[in-house]
Amino acid sequence: MSIEFKNVDYVYAPGTPFQTQGLIDISFKIEKGSFVAIAGHTGSGKSTLMQHFDGLLLPSKGEITVAGEQINANTSSKALKAIRKKVGLVFQFPENQLFEETVLKDVMFGPLNFGFSEQKAKEQAVEWIKKVGLSEDMMDKSPFELSGGQMRRVAIAGVMAYEPEILCLDEPAAGLDPEGQKQMFEIFKEYQRAGHTVILISHNMDDISEYADDMLVLDHGHLIKHASPQEIFSDQEWVKKHYLDEPATSRLTRELQKGGFQFSEMPLTIESLVSKVANELKKKGDMDE
């Protein structure tokens, strides 16, 4: 088991006039090595939930287990450091986690902070700077001289350089062009294939349907659905009711069904849809012979 929540509540500004319930009685389990998407409309609690994974926020009530480590309302700062070595969090706004004077130093910070030698930290940083698509001539530049998309790549490299067991990503493709988005998601998927757990917050249902194998849907601090993307996107009425967008493949599949195509299950990628359509056409061709 990678992550387990048991009856978790989170309250912002408790005991003040600004008290707000951020999470309400949340319980779920995430298996090690899975790619999990967190979806829901703005203000549903997605980022609040993710910030509990590394103890950036502590639950007001309930218990969390992350990679064998326990988190509750009384977890100490010392215990949290062990958790944060196992959980890497990339924020929605990369400028919030960049602070060093050069790109290389910024990406080295995580490995150094978690006990890597100077040489090993530099090797890891250089490797991941290249993996996320940045050139070597950027390593000595200030991260604040870069474009928004480049800053996002630096922030991602800075977390992945110490190779945490669990990688948490809050809208990681924002600010990237379509080619850059695909490149980054392939990196995340490869990271999952290497045995790590990847957790994604995204408003883009196409990304979720293509890359995730598990999905949590939040609404006003409640967990209202925990299922596979295939199960969730197969229920068009439920998706509409909870203000989620349908992936493009789901919409296209429904149009094909209106034209007489039959699918035993909802294809979630263009590749799988093309394959299923080709099989249907072949069956029809065989029947006509």
Swiss-Prot record:
Question: From which domain of life does this come?
Answer: Bacteria
Q: What is its main location?
A: membrane
In the bilayer, the protein is annotated as: Peripheral membrane protein
Keywords, alphabetical: ATP-binding, Cell membrane, Membrane, Nucleotide-binding, Translocase, Transport
Q: What is its EC number?
A: 7.-.-.-
Residues annotated as binding ATP: G40, H41, T42, G43, S44, G45, K46, S47
Pfam entry (one): ABC_tran
The GO cellular component terms are: ATP-binding cassette (ABC) transporter complex
State the SUPFAM superfamilies in the record. P-loop containing nucleoside triphosphate hydrolases
Give the UniProt subcellular location, in the record's own words. Answer: Cell membrane
**InterPro entries documented for this protein:** AAA+_ATPase, ABC_transporter-like_ATP-bd, ABC_transporter-like_CS, ABC_transpr_CbiO/EcfA_su, ECF_ABC_transporter_ATP-bd, EcfA2, P-loop_NTPase
- In this chain the ABC transporter domain maps to 3-245
The answer on whether this UniProt entry bears the keyword Cell membrane reads yes
Q: Name one GO molecular function term.
A: ATPase-coupled transmembrane transporter activity
This protein's assembly is summarised as: Forms a stable energy-coupling factor (ECF) transporter complex composed of 2 membrane-embedded substrate-binding proteins (S component), 2 ATP-binding proteins (A component) and 2 transmembrane proteins (T component).
Q: What does this protein do?
A: ATP-binding (A) component of a common energy-coupling factor (ECF) ABC-transporter complex. Unlike classic ABC transporters this ECF transporter provides the energy necessary to transport a number of different substrates.
> Family per UniProt?
Belongs to the ABC transporter superfamily. Energy-coupling factor EcfA family.
Protein name, UniProt field = Energy-coupling factor transporter ATP-binding protein EcfA2
Provide the species name.
Lactobacillus johnsonii (strain CNCM I-12250 / La1 / NCC 533)
